[in-house]
Design a protein with these regions (language model features):
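Active-site-proximal helix-loop-helix substrate-binding element of RNase H-like nuclease domains
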Residues: 95-111, 115-118, 184-221
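Histidine/lysine/aspartate-rich catalytic loop segments that bind and position anionic ligands
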Residues: 166-168, 175-190
Length: 250
């Protein structure tokens, strides 16, 4: 009888992200199969050729150069047939700490991750980046864009850890812009008067489960919903729609 990872977790009594895996749509090797109708090439006009991709990381501390990257997740975005920006696909990986990485006990207590748990099924940084970047690059191409731009809640933090991992692995095909980002802290502060994700998400009328918070996949998906909600409300207020008339590139 074959025992699934989920059954192993249940039998071991392990709980939470420290032992588990991302949901079934995440954490598997990317096959390259993507629906050609999922992404709208008009998205390329919306952000001057950049595809927003929401990223969240969970880490062993605050210093991207010295502290471990433990989880990374990404959510691609697309334009639907009504011109609204919506989440498209989600991807995530558990990551093995790089050699010599710092693991701050306070950070691990905060995010609930046990980096040594045998059922994490974590990958090396390079393998995790490869698995995550492949579908991001495919989404960029399908959307008619030239590059991905990272969206995050405190985006400088997530981009810092992504860039540090890319540098450690000498990774040559990073799909993300090296320094430009969209930050939902700023956007939600402006639109909702809230800068904390756990407060901004409910304020925007989006469900929030504190028991799943501080997992990279969950936080990335909720950040994606928040980003889309703010942008779509801005559109409904009568803001210009650049995907219809891109105008001059200045």
């Amino acid at each position: 009888m074959t025992t699934s990872p989920e059954q192993l977790i249940a039998m071991s009594g392990a709980k939470g992200r420290s032992a588990g895996r991302f949901p079934s749509r995440c954490g598997f090797p990317y096959s390259g199969a993507m629906s050609s109708s999922l992404y709208n090439p008009l998205m390329a006009n919306r952000f001057r050729g950049y595809l927003p991709v929401v990223v969240d990381v969970e880490t062993g501390g605050f210093n991207a150069a010295t502290d471990a990257l433990l989880e990374i997740a990404a959510v691609t975005l697309r334009l639907d047939t009504d011109g609204r920006i919506v989440p498209a696909e989600s991807f995530g990986e558990h990551v093995l700490p790089f050699e010599g990485a710092n693991l701050d006990p306070k950070a691990l207590a905060f995010n609930g991750i046990d980096p040594t748990h045998p059922l994490r099924m974590a990958k090396t940084e390079k393998d995790a980046l490869t698995s995550l970047f492949a579908p991001v690059r495919a989404a960029v191409k399908e959307s008619g864009c030239k590059r991905a731009i990272l969206v995050g809640h405190n985006a400088f933090f997530d981009l810092g850890f992504v860039n540090a991992a890319v540098a450690r692995c000498n990774y040559k095909r990073n799909p993300f812009h090296p320094f430009s980002t969209f930050d939902t802290v700023t956007l939600s502060g402006m639109a909702l008067g809230q800068t904390v994700l756990a407060r901004a998400v409910p304020m925007a009328g989006i469900d929030w489960d504190p028991n799943q918070a501080h997992g990279a996949l969950y936080d990335a998906e909720k950040t994606a919903e928040l980003f889309c909600r703010i942008l779509n409300q801005w559109r409904e207020l009568g803001a210009p729609q650049p995907w219809q008339d891109p105008g001059p590139d200045v």
